[in-house]
């Protein structure tokens, strides 16, 4: 909590949004509702993304009472079989219960929170897309967002790839292998993430964006320098310059980015 308060004090005058998630599950942190409440008191828009496996009735009430603006609940299948195809060992019923708890708490406290159901487009759930479009509000969400899936093993295909390539981040080449789609030339549409925000890990490392999952491009640590110093550091500016000047030789972390 001390580190969070240290970060909040540095960003509250200039930041607009604070996202409470990266690689782990944010609801496992019992101090999360308190952290959100502090960010809201500082005037920040707050977002949490969760798989809802730890979204108990008590946690739902605490999140709503914290003033949370938006919660993303990821459910990638609507039978236990299709759900487990991507979220191995997860329980669909727990996720659906979590959505229901959020809806009930939202009504009880008359909260304007956006409850966003996020569904990855996968071959294992494509037969359910039409159903969820019709029923997402009935199961507790206020909004529905479909998202293409990031796959690490895609060069030779992947059983999770949707049948229709339109709904995939990857396209099949003439030789049968797959590449990531290029939505626009990088020199015409440069990355915006490196200029608009950053990721701060639980141990204080400052990363350029959420795609640096292996911490390969860390700017430094917020426990030894201010966030402003790190964000405008030589390391940060060198990375930005490289991405602008060498759009065809991007860092490995950029290969799976969909922006």
Whereabouts are the PLM-identified features?
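Radical SAM enzyme [4Fe-4S]-AdoMet core and its adjacent flexible, acidic
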Residues: 42-45, 61-238, 245-246
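Cysteine-cluster motifs in flexible loop/terminal segments that predominantly coordinate metals
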Residues: 249-259
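Conserved alpha-helical substructure of the radical SAM core
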Residues: 1-70, 81, 85, 93
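Short, intrinsically disordered/low-complexity patches at protein termini
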Residues: 52-53, 231-233, 241-243, 254
């Amino acid at each position: 909590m001390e580190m969070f308060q240290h970060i909040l004090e540095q960003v509250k005058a200039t930041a607009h949004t604070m996202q409470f998630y990266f690689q782990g599950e944010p609801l496992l942190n019992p101090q999360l509702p308190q952290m959100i409440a502090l960010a809201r008191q500082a005037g920040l828009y707050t977002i949490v993304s969760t798989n809802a496996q730890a979204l108990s009735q008590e946690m739902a009430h605490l999140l709503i009472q914290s003033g949370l603006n938006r919660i993303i609940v990821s459910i990638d299948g609507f039978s236990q079989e299709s759900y487990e195809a991507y979220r191995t060992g997860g329980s669909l019923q727990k996720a659906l219960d979590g959505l229901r708890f959020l809806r009930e708490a939202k009504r009880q406290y008359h909260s304007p929170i956006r409850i966003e159901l996020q569904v990855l487009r996968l071959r294992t759930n494509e037969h359910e897309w039409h159903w969820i479009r019709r029923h997402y509000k009935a199961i507790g969400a206020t909004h529905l967002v479909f998202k293409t899936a990031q796959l690490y093993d895609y060069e030779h295909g992947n059983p999770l790839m949707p049948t229709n390539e339109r709904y995939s981040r990857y396209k099949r080449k003439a030789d049968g292998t797959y590449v990531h789609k290029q939505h626009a030339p990088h020199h015409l549409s440069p990355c915006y993430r490196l200029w608009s925000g950053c990721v701060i890990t639980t141990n204080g490392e400052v990363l350029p964006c959420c795609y640096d999952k292996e911490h390969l491009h860390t700017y430094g640590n917020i426990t030894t320098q201010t966030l402003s110093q790190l964000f405008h550091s030589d390391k940060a500016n060198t990375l930005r310059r490289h991405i602008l000047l060498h759009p065809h030789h991007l860092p490995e972390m950029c290969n799976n980015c969909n922006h």
